A protein has these predicted regions:
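Short N-terminal segments immediately surrounding and downstream of signal-peptide cleavage
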Residues: 28-45, 55, 105, 109-111
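SH3/SH3-like beta-barrel superfamily modules
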Residues: 49-87
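Flexible, acidic/histidine-containing loops and adjacent segments that form or flank the divalent-metal
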Residues: 94, 98-107, 114-115, 150, ...
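Structured surface patches comprising rigid loops and adjacent beta-strands/short helices at the edges
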Residues: 86-94
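Bacterial N-terminal signal peptides that target proteins for export
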Residues: 1-14
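Sec/Tat signal peptide C-region and signal peptidase I cleavage site
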Residues: 22-28
Length: 429
């Protein structure tokens, strides 16, 4: 299928009675590098590097513009040739149309009410990505499946395909429904932190086997700190992590943190063994609208994250999915200062479900955390009273005047983003 377009073009030329020169002379179009990328010796991620163009560099596409495994064959300014993945470059026509976005150029972050758990569907004009697929029980999983079926019934153009599934860490409230999703829909790629143990180890093992059996693209061994180190302060990306390439406004997806195999300065043994600190941190940009997902990352890892990116703007975002369901250890002043978010969304259960593993039992979200978030969030909202936890199984009322939302308060929450950075919020209750 991948080679059908070039064959059709060649056939059309023959019908017209035209002779054509070698591919490198028949077609030439300059493209601009959108973000730092590796030009490779062959059209595959495992091949050697030729060079490392930076954003703004221009390359010339060869081979009639055909792609091989998602890679363009390109010529560099110094005459060398290599292969670059198509999501890292922009054609002039794309630049022209991106400047004036169309009515359909909208992204939506669907924060799905999973009770005490997490699942966020990112909807783009040309694809969809899922971050986590966990909930407190099978009822939450039923809701996720129903939500996704309704979504794809509306977005028939996506053909029941999730371009990538990310699981931030191996806890059951983040991957309980993972296999149900994988078996119900087509999965284009799978990314996790590679940690085999934790309360979500059974879904993690089942998904690992499923990925291998179905040849689903993945990051072998999971995203780890060595990969993040090699990416520098740009974050880790590539065709598996960022598989969505829309023609007018192209989303940018990066992983900013992954698994730690060794302690960082200031970490205790307990910090390293804590699965929450191994959470993937995912940054998504759609035009000027930027989102950050920190999983269940706690204070030691958060401080390491802030330190790593202190000289970049990658943590400066508009929407934050609050870490660790609004637990006090998932929110820090330094992270809030680095983000300066316009709004925040907490994925947590409601305070009226008095059961094991519930928001009520854990005491989520904590008053201290909500207070810090409300002080940092820039957008205001009409005053509304919500229940917050003063401790496990102890709740009282908090009056929100800032744009802080929670699935336990508001149900399913949609944050719609336009390329110019305009954000609107709707919820199911």
């Amino acid at each position: 299928m991948a080679g059908s377009a070039p064959r059709r073009r060649a056939f059309a030329l023959l019908l017209a009675g035209l002779a054509f020169a070698p591919a490198t002379a028949a077609f030439a179009q300059d493209v601009t590098v959108k973000r730092n990328v590796t030009v490779r010796e062959a059209p595959r991620r495992s091949s050697g590097a030729v060079t490392y163009p930076v954003a703004g560099d221009r390359l010339t596409i060869l081979d009639n513009g055909a792609k091989s495994h998602g890679y363009y064959h390109v010529r560099l300014a110094d005459g060398r040739t290599g292969w670059v993945y198509y999501t890292y470059v922009t054609k002039p026509a794309q630049l022209a149309t991106a400047a004036a976005s169309q009515p359909g150029d909208v992204a939506v972050a669907h924060f799905i009410d999973m009770d005490q758990g997490n699942a966020t569907l990112l909807e783009f004009p040309c694809g969809a990505v899922l971050i986590d697929a966990g909930g407190r029980d099978t009822v939450a999983g039923d809701h996720l499946l129903a939500y996704l079926h309704a979504f794809f019934a509306r977005r028939t153009d996506l053909n029941n395909r999730i371009a990538a599934i990310f699981v931030t860490h191996t806890h059951i409230d983040h991957n309980r429904a993972l296999m149900r999703v994988a078996e119900a829909f087509t999965v284009g790629g799978y990314i996790d932190n590679g940690v085999p143990n934790g309360s979500g180890r059974n879904p993690a093992k089942a998904m690992k086997d499923y990925v291998a059996a179905h040849s689903i693209p993945t990051i072998a061994g999971g995203v780890d700190s060595k990969m993040i180190d090699e990416a520098g302060t740009s974050g880790l990306s590539g065709p598996v992590i960022d598989p969505v390439a829309c023609p007018r406004v192209d989303p940018d997806i990066r992983v900013l943190s992954g698994r730690y195999d060794d302690k960082l300065p200031g970490w205790s043994d307990e910090d390293l063994d804590n699965g929450n600190n191994q959470s993937l941190v995912i940054r998504v940009a759609y035009g000027k609208a930027k989102f950050l997902f920190t999983g269940d990352m706690e204070e030691p890892a958060i401080e390491s994250l802030v330190t790593r990116y202190q000289n970049s703007d990658l943590l400066d975002v508009d929407v934050w999915e609050v870490g660790h369901h609004g637990s006090q250890n998932g929110v820090t002043p330094s992270l809030l200062a680095a983000m300066s978010p316009e709004m925040a969304v907490i994925s947590m259960g409601n305070s009226t479900t008095h059961a094991l593993w519930s928001a009520y039992a854990y005491g989520h979200p904590r008053r201290a955390a909500v207070t810090l978030i409300a002080q940092a969030v820039r957008r205001e909202r009409s005053p509304t009273d919500v229940p917050v936890a003063d401790g496990a199984k102890r709740f009282s009322t908090f009056t929100l005047t800032k744009a802080v939302y929670g699935t336990g308060w508001n149900g399913d929450i949609d944050v719609k983003a336009l390329p110019d950075g305009t954000l609107t919020v709707t919820s199911s209750r």
